[in-house]
Design a protein with these regions (language model features):
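Residue-level signal for well-ordered alpha-helical positions
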Residues: 65, 117-118
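Residues at the C-termini of beta-strands that transition into short coil/loop
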Residues: 9, 78-80, 140, 150-155
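Short, hinge-like loop/turn segments at secondary-structure boundaries
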Residues: 69-70, 92-95, 121-122
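Short, low-complexity, intrinsically disordered N-terminal peptides in bacterial proteins
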Residues: 1-4, 154-157
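A glycine-rich beta-strand to alpha-helix segment
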Residues: 97-117
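Domain-level recognition of soluble alpha/beta enzyme cores
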Residues: 119-148, 154
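Internal catalytic or translocation cores that form aromatic/hydrophobic pockets or channels
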Residues: 85-102
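Active-site-proximal alpha-helix that buttresses catalytic centers in soluble enzyme cores
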Residues: 2-87, 124, 131-134
Length: 157
């Protein structure tokens, strides 16, 4: 059975340059909130059984509209936090996929590392490694291995 892992890069956050508090607290912009709502509409039909996110505010906020629409809680893990190891994040995704379809929200560096790692195993993925905010990779998992994936561009704002 093929299980889908929706690996989402968080929506547009406030600019780092003007942010004086810890980066983990940096929230979405108004545009980011619109992107999060559009992502919720896009992913809602897939009805992931779980939503797992980086604990950074911008990632949790990206999944809030989807969590509300599906009436499920957002779980957080440091394994999806900015700067996390891509191999550890991929292991987490594969583990989570054993329970069915899952949505995971992370950061550009982690998403890049996961997708790059998948491609080094010989899986062909058509799409960018470095993805823009509010876009995603839908990875297809069978037997605990990624067997394919589809890039999903960010929804129009």
């Amino acid at each position: 059975m093929t299980v889908r892992v929706h690996l989402v890069r968080h929506a547009k956050a406030k600019n780092r340059a003007g942010w004086t508090e810890p980066d983990a607290l940096r929230p979405l912009t108004k545009r980011g909130r619109r992107e999060a709502a559009a992502l919720a509409e896009l992913l809602r039909a897939s009805a992931p059984a779980r939503l797992v996110s980086s604990p950074f505010v911008r990632c949790v906020q990206t999944f809030e509209p989807l969590a509300e629409a599906l009436d499920i809680a957002i779980e957080t893990t440091e394994l999806l936090a900015e700067g996390a190891d891509g191999g550890g994040a991929l292991d987490l995704l594969l583990s989570l996929s054993r329970g069915g379809s899952v949505g995971c929200c992370t950061h550009g560096d982690v998403l890049y590392a996961v997708v790059r790692t998948v491609t080094t195993t010989g899986v062909r993925l058509d799409g960018p490694l470095d993805v823009p905010v509010a876009s995603a990779w839908v990875l297809e998992v069978e037997g605990g291995q990624v067997v394919g994936g589809t890039f999903v561009e960010r929804p129009s704002r």
